[in-house]
């Protein structure tokens, strides 16, 4: 099995786009890329825009040759109705989606999911609602958790976690569980016993606003439990990489992993690259170059459509 992170915060954008290849299947998870509309009360910097444009091209190119596309929920850094990533990527693909009607918040149920489904209408070879189901595709098993909360607050909606297995190993893609602040977030991982997990990490950059201290502490404890679950590799990237001090936040997880011989890494480091932290350094970027960014029309429309 081969795992290739395509776009993540440690690669310079908001995304969790990941390519997973088994012996007989190529699966693309959450093919979307976005930026923070505002951070430190600043719009995206030109370096962020350029990086998004670069990775969008990579993502579209990767999508041409995949068999399966998975959409874990309907936030714009996980799905795209055509703002940045053209919906033609879904042509002739088997597409697994989060249930657009059940266990979903109102903004996704009544606006984002319907718009997305209209945008890809008649393009996939088949669309399957995936929540809580298991599918055999060739010699590959793709399992989905029941919908679990998007972090500690159900008002942000629900996501489905994904386990992809071949005869050799299993990888879990947690989607946006925000570092597992609820015990229900752990159930799927304990059932599937993966060798590799891709997890987003807590919203520590919003501590004191959206995230409570006790929720952060619970997320870290639960991530420690995940590391103890027989894993070989943990890729922690997405929400927590929006915090410039992410390594300090994750130190207890790193320490336990080191004791157990588990590799913990960002998506960039997994690819043997230095993390390219842009959003968390936006103030610094504007101090270096204060010119307003040139936004492509699609990206401008995406950013005006709202965060998440």
UniProtKB/Swiss-Prot annotation:
Query: A single Pfam family, by name?
Result: Lactamase_B_2
Q: Which residues cross the membrane?
A: none
Q: Which InterPro entries match?
A: Metallo-B-lactamas, RibonucZ/Hydroxyglut_hydro, UPF0173_UPF0282_UlaG_hydrolase, UPF0282_hydrls
Q: Which SUPFAM superfamilies match?
A: Metallo-hydrolase/oxidoreductase
Task: Return the similarity comment.
Answer: Belongs to the UPF0282 family.
Q: What is this protein called?
A: UPF0282 protein M1425_2116
What phylogenetic lineage does the species belong to?
Answer: Archaea, Thermoproteota, Thermoprotei, Sulfolobales, Sulfolobaceae
């Amino acid at each position: 099995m081969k795992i290739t992170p395509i776009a993540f915060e440690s690669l310079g954008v908001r995304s969790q786009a990941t390519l997973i290849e088994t012996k007989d299947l190529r699966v693309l998870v959450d093919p979307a890329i976005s930026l923070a509309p505002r951070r430190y009360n600043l719009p995206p910097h030109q370096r962020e825009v350029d990086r998004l444009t670069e990775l969008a091209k990579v993502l579209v190119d990767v999508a041409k040759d995949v068999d399966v596309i998975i959409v874990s929920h309907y936030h714009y850094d996980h799905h795209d109705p055509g703002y940045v990533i053209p919906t033609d990527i879904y042509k002739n693909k088997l597409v697994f989606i989060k249930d657009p009607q059940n266990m979903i918040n109102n903004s996704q149920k009544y606006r984002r999911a319907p718009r997305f489904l209209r945008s890809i209408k008649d393009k996939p070879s088949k669309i399957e609602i995936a929540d809580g189901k298991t599918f055999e595709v060739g010699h590959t098993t793709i399992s989905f958790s029941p919908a679990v909360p998007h972090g500690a607050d159900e008002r942000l909606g629900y996501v489905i976690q994904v386990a992809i297995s071949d005869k050799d190993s299993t990888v879990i893609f947690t989607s946006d569980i925000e570092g597992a602040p609820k015990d229900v977030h752990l159930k799927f991982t304990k059932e599937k016993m993966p060798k590799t997990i891709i997890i987003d990490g807590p919203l520590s950059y919003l501590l004191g606003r959206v995230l409570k201290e006790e929720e952060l502490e619970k997320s870290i404890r639960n991530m420690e439990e995940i590391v103890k679950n027989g894993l070989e590799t943990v890729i922690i990237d997405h929400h927590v990489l929006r915090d410039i001090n992410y390594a300090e936040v994750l130190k207890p997880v790193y320490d336990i992993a080191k004791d157990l011989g588990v590799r913990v890494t960002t998506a960039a480091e997994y690819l043997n690259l230095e993390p390219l932290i842009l959003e968390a350094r936006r103030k610094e970027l504007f101090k270096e170059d204060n010119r307003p960014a040139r936004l492509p029309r699609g990206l401008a429309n995406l950013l005006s459509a709202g965060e998440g």
